[in-house]
């Protein structure tokens, strides 16, 4: 598998699956499983029993992980691939479409 170039806090766009076209912020990335949690994308319904933390219990709606291959980095509303470059002796992420430094 290739390296995961998406990081927590990035804005991404879903390019495949039931939520195709939606944009959201990455909440977490799991490089081992090649998945990411994206805010408001791939919502699932979970039934929770009452517990000390959740007195009420009931039906919860939460994000489920989505495969990294189904999302693309979104720069100003357009998808772009991410590359790496060295600027001032530091390795930085670069948008391949525009050449703009991401972080």
UniProtKB/Swiss-Prot annotation:
Record's subunit section: Part of the 50S ribosomal subunit.
Q: Which HAMAP family match?
A: Ribosomal_uL24_B
Q: Which UniProt keywords apply?
A: Ribonucleoprotein, Ribosomal protein, RNA-binding, rRNA-binding
Q: What taxonomic classification does the UniProt entry list for its organism?
A: Bacteria, Bacillati, Bacillota, Clostridia, Lachnospirales
The entry sums up its family as follows: Belongs to the universal ribosomal protein uL24 family.
GO MF, one term, reads: structural constituent of ribosome
Q: Which PANTHER family match?
A: MITOCHONDRIAL RIBOSOMAL PROTEIN L24 (PTHR12903)
Protein name per its UniProtKB record: Large ribosomal subunit protein uL24
Show the GO cellular component annotation of the record.
ribonucleoprotein complex; ribosome
SUPFAM superfamilies per the UniProt record, alphabetical? Translation proteins SH3-like domain
């Amino acid at each position: 598998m290739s390296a995961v170039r998406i990081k927590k806090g990035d804005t991404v766009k879903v390019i495949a699956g039931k939520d195709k076209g939606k944009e959201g912020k990455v909440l977490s990335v799991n490089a081992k499983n090649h998945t990411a949690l994206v805010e408001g994308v791939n919502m699932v319904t979970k039934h929770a029993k009452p517990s000390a933390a959740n007195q009420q219990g009931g039906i919860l709606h939460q994000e489920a992980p989505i495969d990294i291959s189904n999302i693309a980095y979104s720069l100003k509303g357009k998808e772009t691939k991410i590359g790496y470059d060295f600027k001032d002796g530091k390795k930085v992420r670069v948008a391949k479409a525009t050449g703009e430094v991401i972080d």
